[in-house]
Swiss-Prot record:
Record-linked InterPro entries: Adenosylhomocyst_ase-like_sf, Adenosylhomocysteinase-like, Ado_hCys_hydrolase_NAD-bd, NAD(P)-bd_dom_sf, S-Ado-L-homoCys_hydrolase_CS
Protein name: Adenosylhomocysteinase
EC top class named in words: hydrolase
Natural source organism: Aromatoleum aromaticum (strain DSM 19018 / LMG 30748 / EbN1)
Subcellular location(s) of the protein: Cytoplasm
Residues annotated to bind substrate: 61, 136, 196, 226, 230
UniProt-recorded Gene Ontology molecular function terms: adenosylhomocysteinase activity
Residues at which NAD(+) binds: 197-199, 231, 260-265, 283, 318, 339-341, 384
Database matches in PANTHER family: ADENOSYLHOMOCYSTEINASE (PTHR23420:SF0)
Segments forming a coiled coil: none
Protein's gene: ahcY
């Protein structure tokens, strides 16, 4: 399908003519996403999301297209935007628009466009409102909460701390000028949010602790079949894909620094070591640092690594992990990139005044006053999505199966979830894993009743306690 009905104009994509290509890749992805497709089949007749109006803010990729079409197959209406200005796959967005789903996503969109699109996914053509949010990084959730606060006290928009906040605050001011209750009305209609990633989850917990969160949230990120698979195994494949596509660098023999040794850092370090890099790790947490050391990685500080390493990867979820003084001391042609959700892990703002030379889209030389150049990938945003196509379909099937289950759970059992941040129960985590195993022809051992009694668990599971660390 390369065109939409003449009266359907509720979308913004780069080129609708790419829809045919996108549809072909979606069909391939479906064969690699067993968990998500099994859930689509299981609930197709019941239609548990009938009546759900979902605002989706998540990378508009081929894999996300399969998620969107699963949600609609289960009865939901959906409006979608990407959660990152560089992560959209234009052919995926075109295919979704051609199917009649409102989508607003263009690879390389401006910050102004980004926040415009994030507003538009809350605006339904019939004047109705979204009742669910599916978020990645928390921007859709943030927009409604911050906007509602600004309705009461516009001074919350007085001091932007970054260029992105400046653009966001301006967008909120403009919307309030035309509709003073735009945010609070939409905020009140939301039943809940399901959050995809570590950074967004941190935001939710902070909002809840401050008493600011206005609806329940399910923390999808901390489902085992998300964080221990998407974050680790997904990054293990997609990080080096992005670095290689961007630079064609020979990784073997280089010193590569991984900043942060959580699940994303673990996968990133494994990937770089598999290509025979000398991998160093920076960490603040002594437990994670000890894990890195026991895996054979050298644990150092950024202050030490800055002038010695060849490749730098941030994956901490923190702020200014690589500062200006670090970059000023780096080698000529050092490669600097980020695989954490937001672009502020690297202090890109501090080097914006220098000369930039675009090598190709999302690959820039930043030229320092002394003539030294570093290679900055995706302008400090997600390198695997900015410079490549993100995680493989198979691992995203686990994450998106969790998202779909979480949407069903919150939408159909809203009364069971007072305002707070929740995780999915263990038996649903195990269900996703079972569905995924089928694709790999794995043979799962069945627990005998006497064995189950011996260790005190049901034959059918769940098999681990809630606090078990995988």
């Amino acid at each position: 399908m390369n065109s939409v009905a003449e009266n359907f104009t509720d979308y913004v994509v780069a080129d609708l003519a790419l829809a045919g290509w996108g549809r072909k890749e979606i069909r391939i992805a479906e064969t690699e996403m067993p968990g998500l497709m099994a859930i689509r089949e299981e609930f197709a007749v019941v239609q548990p999301l009938k009546g759900a109006r979902i605002t989706g803010s998540l990378h508009m990729t081929i894999q996300t297209a399969v998620l969107i079409e699963t949600l609609t197959a289960l009865g939901a209406e959906v409006r979608w935007a990407s959660c990152n200005i560089f992560s959209t796959q234009d052919h995926a967005a075109a295919a979704i628009a051609a199917s009649g789903v409102p989508v607003f996503a263009v690879k390389g969109e401006s910050l102004a466009d980004y926040w415009d699109y994030t507003h538009r996914i809350f605006e339904w053509r019939d004047g109705g409102y979204s009742n669910m949010i599916l978020d990645d990084g928390g921007d859709a959730t943030l927009l409604l909460h911050l906007g509602a606060r600004a309705e009461k006290d516009v001074s919350v928009l007085a001091k932007p701390g970054s260029e992105e906040e400046r653009v966001l605050f301006a967008a909120i001011r403009a919307k309030l000028a035309s509709d003073p209750t735009w945010y609070s009305v939409r905020l009140a209609a939301i039943r809940g949010v399901t959050e995809e990633t570590t950074t967004g989850v941190h935001r939710l917990y902070q909002m809840f602790e401050r008493g600011e969160l206005k609806f329940p949230a399910i923390n999808v990120n901390d489902s085992v079949t998300k964080s221990k698979f998407d974050n680790l195994y997904g990054c293990r494949e997609s990080l080096v894909d992005g670095i290689k596509r961007a630079t064609d660098v020979m990784v073997a023999g280089k010193v590569a620094v991984v900043c942060g040794y959580g699940d994303v850092g673990k996968g990133s370090a494994q990937a770089l070591r598999a290509l025979s890099a000398q991998v160093w790790v920076t960490e603040i947490d002594p437990i994670c640092a000890l894990q890195a050391a026991m895996e054979g990685y050298r644990v150092v500080t950024m202050d030490y690594a800055a002038e010695h390493a060849d490749i730098f990867v941030t994956c901490t979820g923190n702020y200014h992990v690589i500062r200006h003084d670090h970059m000023a001391r780096m080698k000529d042609q050092a490669i600097v990139c980020n695989i954490g959700h937001f672009d502020n892990e690297i202090d890109v703002a501090s080097i914006e005044g220098y000369e930039w030379e675009e090598i190709k889209p999302q690959v820039d030389h930043v030229i320092f006053p002394d003539g030294k150049r570093i290679i900055l990938l995706a302008k400090g945003r997600l390198v695997n999505l900015g410079c490549a196509t993100g995680h493989p379909s198979y691992v995203m099937s686990s994450s998106f199966a969790n998202q779909t289950i979480a949407q069903i759970e919150l939408f159909t059992r809203t009364a069971d979830y007072p305002v707070g941040v929740y995780t999915l129960p263990k038996h649903l985590d195990e269900k996703v894993a079972r569905l995924q195993l089928k694709k790999l022809n794995a043979q799962l051992t069945e627990l005998r009743p006497d064995q189950a009694a011996y260790i005190g668990v049901p034959v059918e599971g769940p098999y681990k306690s809630a606090h078990y660390r995988y």
